[in-house]
Amino acid sequence: MAPPSVENGSDTSTAKRRRIALACNACRLRKSRCDGTRPSCSSCVSLTLDCQYEPGESAANVIVRKQYISDLESRVYNVEQVVHRLNYFFEGHLSACATATGNATVTAAAAQSRLPRIPSPPAPSSSALEETNDGSHPHATGLEEPQDEDATTNGMAMTFVEEHTSAFFGGSSNINFTRLLLKAVNNIRNPARRLGATVDQQHELSETNLAKASRSYTNPVAASPDTGPKAMTTLPPAQEMDRMLDVYFKTAGTVFPFIHEESMRKTYTTCKASNWTRVRRTFLGTLNVIFATIASADQDAIPSARERQERSNIFFKRATALCSELSKQVISIEIVQYLVLVVIHCQGAQRSVQAWNILGLAVRSAMALGLHSAQAREGLDELQAEYSRRTWVVIYCMDKVLSVAFGRPAIIPDEYMLDQPSSSSEVAMPTPDSAGTGVDIPGDFLAVSFRLHQIMNGSLRQQYGGNVHTAEPEPDDMMSLQASGQLRKELRAWSASLPPYLRLCEPKAKIPSENTSVNRLRVILTLRYHNINMLIHRPLLCSTIRHLFLGGNSVSIDNSSYIIQLAMGEAHESLRSAQHTIELVHTIIKADPSGSNNLGVAYFTLHYVFTASLVVLGRILWAQHGQGAAADETALAMCKSLLGQVETIFQLLDHDNSLVYSCSRYINNMLEVCTAQDAIVAVQNAESGDSSAHQPPSSLAAKQLETMMHLGMGDMEMFQAYSSQIYDPALSEGLDTSSVEAATARNTDWENSFWAM
């Protein structure tokens, strides 16, 4: 018999079915054919069964399609990006979810260490620039400093608990003056409490100067997406970098002239010409801090403060990734200048705690480098020696500014500054502004600023006890008068010695409205002058308020009436400076609300205006309740007019700025409290001996003071820039127990919502 034909067999044969390496659980139990489709096979879909794949012990060599792995990686990457964006935008904004957000951040970070990441495109070896996905941002390659290795996961599935912070604020801080105003308001409402007010006054001051209620620590920079080796070397387009450098040296680089522009631009041009193949890590970090500072302050480029801060955080995170650890291990002039730039940036970016801590590191590094010693600079060439000296002077000035703001002891004594020249003309350096004039305008500005901050330091030592003790120095009206008189003479002598092109300006003059770099320096000097004048005369205003509302001063008994009258007369000097500050800023911002006006950075303007507003509020309290039954209507009208100008300033100063909104809201609430009508009734009743003076105040005043107390416990971050995180429930210690109990129930939610700004 002939064998069967191959052709006949081929007609009846069928194609082999594809072998499935792993069948789903349902098909294996039913012993049916499984097509292996993920996530659900066709059989399970048709039977509406739950399709699950569980590899057995023999499935170690199961082959999974590459496309499936790629899809999983893509999905995980997208989820991670969404989580990062949510954490970045909403951490601190959803107060009720603060704990959950922190845990989500840790969980997401742990998940990233375990899950595979989509590999980034490899950098071409022949190109010096690494492009991002859109190809628009270059990357610096070939960093000369060794890159710090990231810490590896310890495998313990550790979850960090919340960190808490508390702080000390001394007599020069705004929080101290605000406490005094609130205590005075409380005593106006409750005259009977004056009898026992002085018994525990010293103990109360000692306790309230410490922020006893801690708050959880959140870092807005840490909440942003991770900065990897590639991200931290990313640079904006060359045109954008050129623009930001130009803006820096025209603004901040003139106010703080400690970086030589020509040398900086030469290094920048060299790195750019070499496609950033070789660049010092410190230089790249310094460049990013400059970009962060300009990005946060350039209102003309981005009107919204929130958007500017988001963009600024990107540059700041790159800078810290590059130089944060390096600055603790290496000492060089570039590292010191980097730290000074970080202090300036943090002070203007509502990171006051970072500014204070990093300033300490900058001072130590500068001393280790010998910047405080003229002999150590003798071996340097003239240019290096001059800019080393300028760096030390800027550190000294920042030390005094932060010491006043925080109410804490200064680090650098005046004995370390004896070798500073009396005029910058002795060491004049050529600058673009001085071309053809032979005058180093930034150098002269730094020299006169240095002498002004020396007067500020004298006020700290003589009037505020150097902010050394937890309590205010024992108030002595005679010593306060003598100190303020001497410091006022020094301040006026400083003003008279200014060069003609840096003379102080008046609010009604034409100079503030003419936008030039020199006029901007004059306006800044004028604002600094009046701010220090308020600092010098504020102790006299405090003595007046204590005498009128807090039972007077037991120390100055002899001739107390005469001394108090002198103190009251001198206290008006602080109000005059507050008036000049508000009117000057109001005139400039009404004429030109753009970021190119003569005010400079909005943050520092906000600081000066807010400090002046507190002085005006003190004068309102004095005029409304401090001189018998009749209020000083003339002074009240003038002060309320000034606060009306302050409200206009806050509206025009910046857009979408939560700190400005908070300042405006706080001033308005303080004004309501200080002008409460029932307080007058309380004073009148107390003077007439009416027993009703000891009865609880009206519901209106109780509500206002409850609101103020409530703001004191939660709505106080507006002080962070200059009072250094004023958050302190001690502001409410002198208020009625009923008000405290009424607000306690709502305190937590309000506190969290405000701190989330």
Curated annotation (Swiss-Prot):
This protein's UniProt keywords: DNA-binding, Metal-binding, Nucleus, Transcription, Transcription regulation, Zinc
DNA-binding region: 24-51
Name of this chain's protein: Transcription factor FVEG_08294
GO BP term, example: DNA-templated transcription
Transmembrane segments: none
Cellular location(s): Nucleus
Induction: Expression is induced in response to 2-benzoxasolinone (BOA) exposure.
Phylogenetic classification of the source organism: Eukaryota, Fungi, Dikarya, Ascomycota, Pezizomycotina
